[in-house]
Amino acid sequence: MNLPVQTDERQPEQHNQVPDEWFVLNQEKNREADSVKRPSLSYTQDAWRRLKKNKLAMAGLFILLFLFVMAVIGPFLSPHSVVRQSLTEQNLPPSADHWFGTDELGRDVFTRTWYGARISLFVGVMAALIDFLIGVIYGGVAGYKGGRIDSIMMRIIEVLYGLPYLLVVILLMVLMGPGLGTIIVALTVTGWVGMARIVRGQVLQIKNYEYVLASKTFGAKTFRIIRKNLLPNTMGAIIVQMTLTVPAAIFAESFLSFLGLGIQAPFASWGVMANDGLPTILSGHWWRLFFPAFFISLTMYAFNVLGDGLQDALDPKLRR
């Protein structure tokens, strides 16, 4: 007996369907949440951005720019020649005609101050550049080679570092005679030692990084690796050291001038002018010492605060 086949004709249950867009993530909002708000900046741009936030360092930078500009155009702003003498205008105080007064020979102190700025700043910058060239090459090779070569090169540095700096400079000045070139040579004989030690320490830290090892693997020569891979990553410390070398050289030149071993007449530097003006303080001629000493102090202060600012700005650990 065939039983009738019962078919389930029940309709499928109707469920309330949730719109698909409810389950779609808001990609735009997630993308905004995951994105970094800080703009992409290069190392140099980021360092400049942080340096601009340091008001003291920026003040030092503007002071130095002012001094360098005045060293170029300052002597031309005065109608008086740097070597012109006038026995009727001896030791005149600052006035509308002589803005910084005159010296014992009637020469305009304003003109001589900015002419002396050329020599003082030139000595400082040249000493820093020579220290940079010698110190970077010497320290870079010592740090990169390592081993016995590094030990020998560092023993030489220790010997030079142990010598009395000013004694060596004075001895060279006596042997070679006074002059601008002699001063620069004397200041750089041992002045590069500090730069070499800093560069060596930086190179020792980064010479085993992957990109340096890759250059070695592809057969790059030592000086190419130092120039292309190592030096660009040590420039922060090098620049800071140079900003400290310049005022040190200016101060050393001023000290030598106080000892009578500086620039010879009729030329003048800030140190020579300060040395000439020192005995006149008791006579009431204060301006002869004040202006050169003031600009020496201002230059050293500006370089030091700029160096501190650059040290903070160029430090990769401080990047945000």
Curated annotation (Swiss-Prot):
Top-level taxonomic group: Bacteria
Protein location: Cell membrane
InterPro entries, alphabetized: BP-dependent_transpt_permease, MetI-like, MetI-like_sf, OppC_N
Keywords: Cell membrane, Membrane, Peptide transport, Protein transport, Sporulation, Transmembrane, Transmembrane helix, Transport
Swiss-Prot/TrEMBL GO biological process terms: peptide transport; protein transport; sporulation resulting in formation of a cellular spore
Keyword Transport listed: yes
Example of a GO cellular component annotation carried by this entry: plasma membrane
Membrane topology field: Multi-pass membrane protein
Pfam families in the record: BPD_transp_1, OppC_N
Transmembrane domains' residue ranges: 56-76, 121-141, 154-176, 230-252, 267-287, 289-309
Physiological role: Probably part of the ABC transporter DppBCDE involved in dipeptide transport. Responsible for the translocation of the substrate across the membrane.
KW Mitochondrion (keyword) present: no
UniProt GO molecular function: transmembrane transporter activity
Name of the protein in its database record: Dipeptide transport system permease protein DppC
SUPFAM superfamilies xrefs: MetI-like
Stimuli inducing this protein: Nutrient deficiency conditions, which also induce sporulation.
The family this protein is said to belong to: Belongs to the binding-protein-dependent transport system permease family. OppBC subfamily.
PROSITE patterns according to UniProt: ABC_TM1 (PS50928)
Record-annotated ABC transmembrane type-1 domain positions: 117-307
